[in-house]
Amino acid sequence: VLAILAAGAAAETTFIVGGKSIVNETPFFGRSGLDAVRWQQLVVPSDGVAEGDLRRWEWHSSGGGTPGDFQQFKVQFLEVDRSGLTLPFNSNYENQTPVVIASGDPFVLDAPDAGWFGFDITPSFNYTGRSLLVEVWWSGDSEGGTQCYSKNATRESRCVYACIRNSVNVNGYPNQGKIYNWLHYMRFTVSPIAVEPTSLGRVRALYR
């Protein structure tokens, strides 16, 4: 059976990873005395996010936050060939350069009610199904923000985290970090990569 898809015809699909067993301050909760944060999360193929164009990335707030401004804020994506994270942070780049999918100086975060909040990815990020490194990095805030849900992953080394808390360096910010097994509750919106329109005559010629 030969299926011919029109470009742009496929619908977007959402994929959820992680869980809601833990209320976690990282990485958007300046109210806890956090002055700077660097945070990495690894999403592996078995988490089930399909290949395609990533168009939106979201977190699930536990509610009860306050509006916050985050300085020198950026979110980065990078596909890598690993099943767990190592130290220091930059070793997880595998000699590649991550793609900035969101940034702001400041980035203004409203106080979301319990539920999803996040970022549209423009242009979209082409995801080919390998492990996806997600990184959040900011330095300076207005003591606002929100807590988010996560769970402890069955596989270790899924998260690397460092911060400055109440002027004290924790876990060797910004370069070293400490490994955790947190897997944050996140949602990815994926649009399958469109197939270019092909004339029926061209298809017949290819299959003679």
Regions found by a protein language model. Give the residues of each.
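A short, local hydrophobic-aromatic micro-motif
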Residues: 55-56, 71, 201
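Bacterial N-terminal signal peptides
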Residues: 1-6
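A short beta-strand-loop element at or near the start of a globular domain
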Residues: 19-64
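Proprotein-processing/basic-patch segments
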Residues: 15-24, 131-192
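Aromatic- and Gly/Pro-enriched, solvent-exposed loop/edge beta-strand patches characteristic
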Residues: 49, 68-155
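Boundary/junction segments of secreted and surface-exposed precursor proteins
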Residues: 8-37, 92, 179-208
